[in-house]
Amino acid sequence: MHSTKVPTILAKKNYASPSAFTPENLLGEARRQKGLVEAGVPEVCVLDPDGDMVRRLKRAGRGTVDANWACYHTELYRLTEAGIEFGIVACAVGAPFAVLIAEELFASGCRLLISMTSAGQLVELQSPPYFILIEKALRNEGASYHYLPPAEFSHADPALLDAIAGAFSGLRVPVQRGATWTTDAPFRETAEAIAAMKAKGLMAVEMEAAALYAFAQARRRPVLCFAHVTNQMARVEGDFQKGEADGTVDALAVITTAARRWRSKRT
C-alpha cells in the first residue's frame, strides 16, 4: 500500500517566506571569528567544481588567493583574464554546495555567476570535449525544491541567454545550447535512467545547473551554467580527457567570452 503523504522535501514549503538563516549573517560571523575585514568579491565569479582550472592557474603562478573571502568551506581565487577580474571558487561539487557558495558570492558583491562543470555525454553530438550552454536543467536533485515549487525543469533567464547569443562562434571548441540532467547521485546513473533522459532530448548529465537556475530565478540573480562535456561516464577507454591544460584554456575562453558580452550588454 502506497502512502499518499507529500514527500518530506516538498512538505511545508512557503516559497515567499524569507530564510531565518542568511548568507550575510553567516559571513559576518565568519569575519568576526577570523579577524577579516569586509571586502567585496569581483563582479564576475566562477564556480569550478572539478578544481582543475584553479589547480592549473596556481601551477602557472597566475592569480592570488583572496585573503578576505570569509567562507568556511572554500578559497576564492582572483584572476585577471582579458582585462576582466574573476573570482573563482573550486571544488563546490553538487547542487547544495554550489548553491551555498552562490548565495555567499552574491551576498559579497558578485554581479554575474558562471558555473563551468564537467558533464557526461548523453546525446552524441560529437566526440568530447565540447561545451553546452545550459538553457534548462532537469530537476533530478534536491536543492532546487527549496527555492521553487515542483516542476520538471529549471530554466536560465531568457534575457541573459539572449544577451550572449552568438558570442561563442569564434572559439576553437564548439559551444552548443540545450538541456541537461542534474543529478545528486552520479553512481546511480542506471542504464534505464540514461535511456529515459536521452528520450527527453537531454544532452548531458551534471550535478549543479538545476539548483543554480532555481536559485537564480528565486533570488533574481544572473547565473549562467555551462557543461564541459568531457566523458561518456567511463564506459570507453581513455575517457575524461578535457583538452589542453586539463581544459583550462578552452574553459577560460568560454567564461571570458560570456563575461565580456554580458558586460557590453549592461552598459
Locations of the language-model features?
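Accessory terminal and edge-of-domain segments that mediate assembly/interaction
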Residues: 1-114, 120-267
